[in-house]
């Protein structure tokens, strides 16, 4: 029996050391050297070096002077990140969407873009399609007393064109540009 136990325990200890300690340390070291910003959470800092958020996680911006992110089923909390898991036939989902659409439609004119009414799969998607950002420009321009053309130019600057997929705008980056205009 001892002939079987000792090799099994040795192999278990070796594999635990390799896969539980050495491999994670090696991957972390390579990531810190090759991709330091991404390895540390893609943190976004303001002009004073203060962390304002992550480029990968949406935030709840309140008030008419800010561009708003998609709705979040988990209140923008990373611990509770998930979709609402409500089916399209669920009355609670229909009521939330109707309420959001009515609020957005009162503030603006025209049909509300779908991205401003639906949550993302994670509930934390920081990006919006350019059309959803453009829909909010008149509200933000009026609240901040800025020319619409200036906000359109900022939107163009903040629009990302990924290799695969449609263009998107990072709402945190766009709101940071607006905040810099105020200073």
From Swiss-Prot:
One of its GO terms (cellular component) is plasma membrane. The keyword Cell membrane applies. The chain crosses the membrane at residues 11-31. GO terms for molecular function: ATP binding; P-type potassium transmembrane transporter activity. It is a single-pass membrane protein. It holds the Pfam family KdpC. It is found in: Cell inner membrane. Keywords: ATP-binding, Cell inner membrane, Cell membrane, Ion transport, Membrane, Nucleotide-binding, Potassium, Potassium transport, Transmembrane, Transmembrane helix, Transport. InterPro entries: KdpC. NCBIfam families: kdpC, PRK00315.1. Part of the high-affinity ATP-driven potassium transport (or Kdp) system, which catalyzes the hydrolysis of ATP coupled with the electrogenic transport of potassium into the cytoplasm. This subunit acts as a catalytic chaperone that increases the ATP-binding affinity of the ATP-hydrolyzing subunit KdpB by the formation of a transient KdpB/KdpC/ATP ternary complex. Belongs to the KdpC family. HAMAP family: KdpC. The system is composed of three essential subunits: KdpA, KdpB and KdpC. This is Potassium-transporting ATPase KdpC subunit.
